[in-house]
Amino acid sequence: MFHLVKGLYNNWNKKEQYSILILGLDNAGKTTFLETLKKEYSLAFKALEKIQPTVGQNVATIPVDSKQILKFWDVGGQESLRSMWSEYYSLCHGIIFIVDSSDRERLDECSTTLQSVVMDEEIEGVPILMLANKQDRQDRMEVQDIKEVFNKIAEHISARDSRVLPISALTGEGVKDAIEWMIVRLERNKKSRPPIYK
């Protein structure tokens, strides 16, 4: 009888775990975003001034509430590392694509890179959140300019949830709003991409 009750208790108390892939070109602020996110959820985080370019991946698991866990994979954005992004597509429930809104010169490269992500069949139906990072800088592009680039790609996304939001990973502005947007989409998409229960 004890084992039955224990089994029922464990089953009812399982948490949904969703995996979110953080992508973007090198120097877009992906790791800063992840470390700021950890700080927002009161977890141990790396001092922002100590962040180095990611070679490989950074992983963080963030308990959002009593029922959900978000597992983030921050994958290096250097051109030589982008070929390994596709290895994560079938495992992810959502994608956050971070754009350096102060780097106009790489906007075309960013657009081409995002388009190659969107066109991959493995992420069909996965919500995509594009974050216009570094909005705290004076030389930033307006969010509307970045949306225009994203809108050209959005026609390939069809009915999938997608959005462009402004953030500053450095100051934390907009970071929690972005995650809240993603959580709603992950729950909405539960039937086509079920979470892992932990």
From Swiss-Prot:
<dbReference type="Pfam" id="PF00025">
    <property type="entry name" value="Arf"/>
</dbReference>
<feature type="binding site">
    <location>
        <begin position="133"/>
        <end position="136"/>
    </location>
    <ligand>
        <name>GTP</name>
    </ligand>
</feature>
<dbReference type="GO" id="GO:0034067">
    <property type="term" value="P:protein localization to Golgi apparatus"/>
</dbReference>
<dbReference type="GO" id="GO:0003924">
    <property type="term" value="F:GTPase activity"/>
</dbReference>
<keyword id="KW-0653">Protein transport</keyword>
<dbReference type="GO" id="GO:0005794">
    <property type="term" value="C:Golgi apparatus"/>
</dbReference>
<feature type="binding site">
    <location>
        <begin position="74"/>
        <end position="78"/>
    </location>
    <ligand>
        <name>GTP</name>
    </ligand>
</feature>
<feature type="modified residue" description="N-acetylmethionine">
    <location>
        <position position="1"/>
    </location>
</feature>
<keyword id="KW-0342">GTP-binding</keyword>
<dbReference type="InterPro" id="IPR027417">
    <property type="entry name" value="P-loop_NTPase"/>
</dbReference>
<keyword id="KW-0007">Acetylation</keyword>
<keyword id="KW-0813">Transport</keyword>
<dbReference type="GO" id="GO:0006886">
    <property type="term" value="P:intracellular protein transport"/>
</dbReference>
<comment type="function">
    <text>Involved in the targeting of ARL1 to the Golgi. Can bind and hydrolyze GTP.</text>
</comment>
<comment type="subunit">
    <text>Interacts with SYS1 and SLO1.</text>
</comment>
<comment type="similarity">
    <text>Belongs to the small GTPase superfamily. Arf family.</text>
</comment>
<dbReference type="GO" id="GO:0042175">
    <property type="term" value="C:nuclear outer membrane-endoplasmic reticulum membrane network"/>
</dbReference>
<keyword id="KW-0333">Golgi apparatus</keyword>
<feature type="cross-link" description="Glycyl lysine isopeptide (Lys-Gly) (interchain with G-Cter in ubiquitin)">
    <location>
        <position position="50"/>
    </location>
</feature>
<keyword id="KW-1017">Isopeptide bond</keyword>
<dbReference type="InterPro" id="IPR006689">
    <property type="entry name" value="Small_GTPase_ARF/SAR"/>
</dbReference>
<dbReference type="GO" id="GO:0034976">
    <property type="term" value="P:response to endoplasmic reticulum stress"/>
</dbReference>
<feature type="binding site">
    <location>
        <begin position="24"/>
        <end position="31"/>
    </location>
    <ligand>
        <name>GTP</name>
    </ligand>
</feature>
<keyword id="KW-0547">Nucleotide-binding</keyword>
<dbReference type="GO" id="GO:0005829">
    <property type="term" value="C:cytosol"/>
</dbReference>
<keyword id="KW-0832">Ubl conjugation</keyword>
<protein>
    <recommendedName>
        <fullName>ADP-ribosylation factor-like protein 3</fullName>
    </recommendedName>
</protein>
<dbReference type="GO" id="GO:0005525">
    <property type="term" value="F:GTP binding"/>
</dbReference>
<dbReference type="InterPro" id="IPR024156">
    <property type="entry name" value="Small_GTPase_ARF"/>
</dbReference>
<dbReference type="GO" id="GO:0043001">
    <property type="term" value="P:Golgi to plasma membrane protein transport"/>
</dbReference>
<dbReference type="InterPro" id="IPR005225">
    <property type="entry name" value="Small_GTP-bd"/>
</dbReference>
